[in-house]
């Protein structure tokens, strides 16, 4: 297997006295292998994974506290509803009460 792309099945004439320089070397099929480089510099130390220690103990900044106070109604997470149920139910209910009271007043 080690002499895969070097013409192992054919007798080599270059070994019988002729230099191998003028004959080009056949390349193996497929992607060429990666050439290994010698490490020139020492490897950097690995950084620890995950959340750093003590990051949970920090108090929020003043700007974040003001922002939290100004937010009124909190929306649920995820994709918003196509037809918000609260808005659709409240408006027709108020309109129907007003129209029914107007109709009853007109009938009398």
Curated annotation (Swiss-Prot):
Residues with N-acetylserine modification: 2
Superkingdom in the source lineage: Eukaryota
SMART domains in the record: AT_hook (SM00384)
Record gene name: Hmga2
Modification(s) after translation: Regulated by cell cycle-dependent phosphorylation which alters its DNA binding affinity. Phosphorylated by NEK2.
GO molecular function: 5'-deoxyribose-5-phosphate lyase activity; C2H2 zinc finger domain binding; cAMP response element binding; DNA binding, bending; DNA-(apurinic or apyrimidinic site) endonuclease activity; enzyme binding; MH1 domain binding; MH2 domain binding
GO BP terms in the entry: adipose tissue development; adrenal gland development; astrocyte differentiation; base-excision repair; cell division; cell population proliferation; cell proliferation in forebrain; chondrocyte differentiation
Tissue occurrence: Expressed in mitotic spermatogonia, meiotic spermatocytes, and postmeiotic round spermatids (at protein level). Expressed in embryonic myogenic progenitor cells.
Keyword Phosphoprotein: yes
Span list, region Interaction with E4F1: 44-63
Sequence ranges of Basic residues compositional bias: 46-56
Principal localisation: nucleus
GO CC annotation: male germ cell nucleus; nuclear chromosome; nucleus; protein-DNA complex; senescence-associated heterochromatin focus; SMAD protein complex
Subcellular compartments: Nucleus
Record PTM Phosphothreonine, positions in chain: 40
DNA-binding region: 24-34, 44-54, 71-82
Compositionally biased intervals (Acidic residues): 95-108
Keywords: Acetylation, Cell cycle, Cell division, DNA condensation, DNA-binding, Growth regulation, Meiosis, Mitosis, Nucleus, Phosphoprotein, Repeat, Transcription, Transcription regulation
Assembly and interaction partners: Interacts with E4F1. Interacts with NEK2.
Species the sequence originates in: Mus musculus
Modified positions (Phosphoserine) in chain numbering: 44, 100, 104
Biased composition (Basic and acidic residues): 66-75
Region annotated Disordered, chain positions: 1-108
Family in the record: Belongs to the HMGA family.
Name of the protein: High mobility group protein HMGI-C
């Amino acid at each position: 297997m080690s002499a895969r792309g070097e013409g192992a099945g054919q007798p080599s004439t270059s070994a019988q006295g002729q230099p191998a320089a003028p004959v080009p070397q056949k390349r193996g099929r497929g992607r060429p292998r990666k050439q290994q480089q010698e490490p020139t510099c020492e490897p950097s130390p690995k950084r620890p994974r995950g959340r750093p220690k003590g990051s949970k103990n920090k108090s929020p900044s003043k700007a974040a506290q003001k922002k939290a106070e100004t937010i009124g109604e909190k929306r649920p997470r995820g994709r918003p509803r196509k037809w918000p149920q609260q808005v659709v139910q409240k408006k027709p209910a108020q309109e129907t009460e007003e129209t029914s009271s107007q109709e009853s007043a007109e009938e009398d």
